[in-house]
């Protein structure tokens, strides 16, 4: 029997209709795997050994009672076959420390999804720089003059922080926007923080598409997150609505171009953000949208693809 650990935000406060981590747990349980639940505060390192307080977990697709804890134990993480690192951002120093603890277990043979070193290496906004031919015009700087110049050049731009999630602090600036100065000051904290600028993509009207890749294999359907009226952000957390649809030709082309690098880096479950035919983000920490895609296209099991990939890797 495969022993699966998961590190996640408190299971008591998730929305099971939308939570991809929950879908992963349901699929693992369906395969009779043993589920070990952990939060960040349960992880610790002693004399170089990665350990945790874990609770055995049972899950159920039930709106009121979706989980039940069984016995609690303190164990070496190397006794688990696989651990899903599903903690949501912020990607802060605490998150980084957790990846070092998980890396100690990985060195002893536990499969970590996604690979701890790659979680540190591949910032969700910056990692697109490794694929410049696929992205909009993108500038990363803390220099106000560079940002003003970029705004002048394009006339319609998006400015965003490098560490946000769910569409937080994303600004659209059109030509002659009177707020350009204060937005640059806010995002760069007066030149002390890097931020990202990209030319505005009108195709956002058709949605910001989340394309999932499972161990190098693109899922054939995506979730297009369509901005609410008067919004430029498609994020569901910012009021966008999700619409599942098959991948377009350009989605396939982008996914296939990026997939081999992801697989090589041990990034087994990844969400690409695509607007029109441009790649805007590569989400590696805890990508979502599997539930919504599976609900719309019951012929596909994304979590099934993931558990198959885990089984294959464990057999190697």
UniProtKB/Swiss-Prot annotation:
Cofactor(s) required, per the database record: Mg(2+); Mn(2+)
Segments forming domain ATP-grasp: 125-311
Residues annotated to bind ATP: 151-207
Pfam families: GSH-S_ATP (PF02955), GSH-S_N (PF02951)
Catalytic activity: gamma-L-glutamyl-L-cysteine + glycine + ATP = glutathione + ADP + phosphate + H(+)
Protein name: Glutathione synthetase
Listed InterPro entries: ATP-grasp, ATP_grasp_subdomain_1, Glut_synth_pro, GSHS_ATP-bd, GSHS_N, PreATP-grasp_dom_sf
Cofactor details (free text): Binds 1 Mg(2+) or Mn(2+) ion per subunit.
Keywords: ATP-binding, Glutathione biosynthesis, Ligase, Magnesium, Manganese, Metal-binding, Nucleotide-binding
A GO molecular-function annotation: ATP binding
Lineage: Bacteria, Pseudomonadati, Pseudomonadota, Gammaproteobacteria, Enterobacterales
Pathway noted in the entry: Sulfur metabolism; glutathione biosynthesis; glutathione from L-cysteine and L-glutamate: step 2/2
Gene Ontology cellular component terms for the protein in this record: cytoplasm
Annotated EC: 6.3.2.3
NCBIfam families attached to this UniProt entry: glut_syn, PRK05246.1
Domain of life assignment: Bacteria
Annotated family: Belongs to the prokaryotic GSH synthase family.
């Amino acid at each position: 029997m495969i022993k699966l650990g998961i590190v996640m935000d408190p299971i008591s406060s998730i929305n099971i209709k939308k939570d991809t981590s929950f879908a992963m747990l349901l699929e693992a349980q369906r395969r009779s795997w043993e589920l070990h639940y952990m939060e960040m505060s349960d992880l610790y390192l002693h004399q170089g050994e990665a350990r945790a307080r874990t609770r055995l977990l049972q899950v159920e697709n039930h709106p009121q009672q979706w989980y039940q804890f069984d016995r609690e134990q303190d164990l070496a993480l190397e006794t688990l076959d696989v651990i899903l690192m599903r903690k949501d951002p912020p990607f802060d120093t605490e998150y980084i420390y957790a990846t070092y603890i998980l890396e100690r277990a990985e060195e002893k043979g536990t499969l970590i999804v996604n690979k701890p070193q790659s979680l540190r290496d591949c910032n969700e906004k910056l990692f697109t720089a490794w694929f410049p031919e696929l992205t909009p015009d993108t500038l990363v700087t803390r220099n106000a003059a560079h940002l003003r110049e970029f705004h002048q050049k394009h006339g319609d731009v998006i400015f965003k922080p490098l560490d946000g999630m769910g569409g937080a602090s994303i600004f659209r600036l059109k030509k002659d926007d009177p707020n350009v100065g204060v937005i640059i000051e806010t995002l760069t904290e007066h030149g002390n923080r890097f931020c990202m600028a990209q030319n505005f993509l009108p195709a956002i009207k058709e949605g910001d598409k989340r394309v999932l890749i499972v161990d190098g294999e693109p899922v054939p359907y995506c979730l297009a997150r369509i901005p609410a009226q008067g919004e430029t952000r498609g994020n569901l957390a910012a009021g966008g609505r999700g619409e599942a649809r098959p991948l377009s030709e350009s989605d396939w082309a982008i996914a296939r171009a990026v997939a081999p690098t992801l697989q090589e880096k041990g990034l087994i479950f990844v969400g690409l953000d695509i607007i029109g035919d441009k790649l805007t983000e590569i989400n590696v920490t805890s990508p979502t949208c599997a539930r919504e895609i599976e609900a719309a296209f019951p012929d596909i099991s994304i979590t099934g693809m993931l558990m198959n990939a885990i089984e294959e890797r464990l057999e190697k």
